[in-house]
């Protein structure tokens, strides 16, 4: 064994107890005292180390997506998309790539029930031959806001009050009464899909718009979609109360038990693509994260399948320390100018550095499985053994060179420096279309959830009227029904 390169694992456990530094421990039951009843001695280093380690076991929970469950498996390409992207892991049908997936609730804390009405996170880390690719999405295809400037305020509105530490509906409807762009997202959150049956029976979406780059440098805007082969199933409100009151971890248990029984969850991956030169041809902005791309004019294209066939070995190491960031991409898949995506590129990595430290990408679950090399040395909790003499670039001693240039197409950008909203807001059309796609019973459940939210004692008449106006612009009958239930006169 090379003593300088040994990485501790549970597979190398000794047959007896030791301290963290490896010294044998002959008594792990009793503290060192003066006599049988005397005071504990400070020299009992094993006791001090044991308590100190225990005091530091927990790390800051994620500011969002704190409650989560992970599983491992593989992604397999089933359809040729090599004409659209030069991404190596998508190079040909039959190619398999290891993955780890984390499902989560968004707003609520680490120990909260998995039956609360909340979006679900759906994050996939692909361990490719050209580095990791993190596809960090949700189970709903759109989002509440289109500009990341509003993200901290939005999360504050959803999170418990800083005064009472309780989540309060009046704060949510107050904040979003200023943001009609949220209406489309609320047609998902307040719909039946707002509470998935479990993680196996829910869709996944990349949500943001990315860019695919082909080998000849052609760019296509792209949306990613995961479809479960076992179908989408949801819990109605009363069912969620019953399930959540019985087991707070029902979705995690279902995922773990299904994999252990050999009933492996599977999703099909589809994409929608738009020629980057044609993005102005629609009545919506393809970079607007509050909009879906109509499948009748931009059809889904099959790409591959993902199978989760292995449970994680350790919750802390492979769930709490598992870190995702939309900035982590591979050649052939790039960002777009989606305002929310641009914000996430910074924020996700920044929050992981806060939770896990500057070297979080060295943790085994986050590290790439391919060979990699840079001069990002040292820092807190750097545990990679290095023996290089050259930690700078360029060098005539170290032969490390630049990689081949990506076929990124050139772009000409022009415009004034300004803070502004997009031209094509169109906040009401898609929300109304989705509401009208519901059957009458589903429409009524959606309406009742809004009545419940808007009859909170702290919700003012002004806020109620604004929401009636918004929903009236989506669908006149919905606005009238909401006004009638709230006993207020509609403005439209």
From Swiss-Prot:
<dbReference type="InterPro" id="IPR024708">
    <property type="entry name" value="Catalase_AS"/>
</dbReference>
<keyword id="KW-0575">Peroxidase</keyword>
<dbReference type="Pfam" id="PF00199">
    <property type="entry name" value="Catalase"/>
</dbReference>
<feature type="active site">
    <location>
        <position position="65"/>
    </location>
</feature>
<dbReference type="InterPro" id="IPR002226">
    <property type="entry name" value="Catalase_haem_BS"/>
</dbReference>
<keyword id="KW-0963">Cytoplasm</keyword>
<dbReference type="GO" id="GO:0004096">
    <property type="term" value="F:catalase activity"/>
</dbReference>
<dbReference type="Pfam" id="PF06628">
    <property type="entry name" value="Catalase-rel"/>
</dbReference>
<dbReference type="GO" id="GO:0020037">
    <property type="term" value="F:heme binding"/>
</dbReference>
<dbReference type="GO" id="GO:0005829">
    <property type="term" value="C:cytosol"/>
</dbReference>
<dbReference type="InterPro" id="IPR010582">
    <property type="entry name" value="Catalase_immune_responsive"/>
</dbReference>
<dbReference type="InterPro" id="IPR011614">
    <property type="entry name" value="Catalase_core"/>
</dbReference>
<dbReference type="GO" id="GO:0005782">
    <property type="term" value="C:peroxisomal matrix"/>
</dbReference>
<feature type="active site">
    <location>
        <position position="138"/>
    </location>
</feature>
<keyword id="KW-0479">Metal-binding</keyword>
<dbReference type="GO" id="GO:0005886">
    <property type="term" value="C:plasma membrane"/>
</dbReference>
<comment type="similarity">
    <text>Belongs to the catalase family.</text>
</comment>
<dbReference type="GO" id="GO:0005777">
    <property type="term" value="C:peroxisome"/>
</dbReference>
<protein>
    <recommendedName>
        <fullName>Catalase</fullName>
        <ecNumber>1.11.1.6</ecNumber>
    </recommendedName>
</protein>
<comment type="function">
    <text>Catalyzes the degradation of hydrogen peroxide (H(2)O(2)) generated by peroxisomal oxidases to water and oxygen, thereby protecting cells from the toxic effects of hydrogen peroxide.</text>
</comment>
<feature type="binding site" description="axial binding residue">
    <location>
        <position position="348"/>
    </location>
    <ligand>
        <name>heme</name>
    </ligand>
</feature>
<keyword id="KW-0560">Oxidoreductase</keyword>
<dbReference type="GO" id="GO:0042542">
    <property type="term" value="P:response to hydrogen peroxide"/>
</dbReference>
<keyword id="KW-0576">Peroxisome</keyword>
<comment type="subunit">
    <text>Homotetramer.</text>
</comment>
<dbReference type="InterPro" id="IPR018028">
    <property type="entry name" value="Catalase"/>
</dbReference>
<keyword id="KW-0408">Iron</keyword>
<dbReference type="GO" id="GO:0009725">
    <property type="term" value="P:response to hormone"/>
</dbReference>
<dbReference type="GO" id="GO:0005737">
    <property type="term" value="C:cytoplasm"/>
</dbReference>
<dbReference type="GO" id="GO:0042744">
    <property type="term" value="P:hydrogen peroxide catabolic process"/>
</dbReference>
<dbReference type="GO" id="GO:0046872">
    <property type="term" value="F:metal ion binding"/>
</dbReference>
<keyword id="KW-0349">Heme</keyword>
<keyword id="KW-0376">Hydrogen peroxide</keyword>
<dbReference type="InterPro" id="IPR024711">
    <property type="entry name" value="Catalase_clade1/3"/>
</dbReference>
<dbReference type="InterPro" id="IPR020835">
    <property type="entry name" value="Catalase_sf"/>
</dbReference>
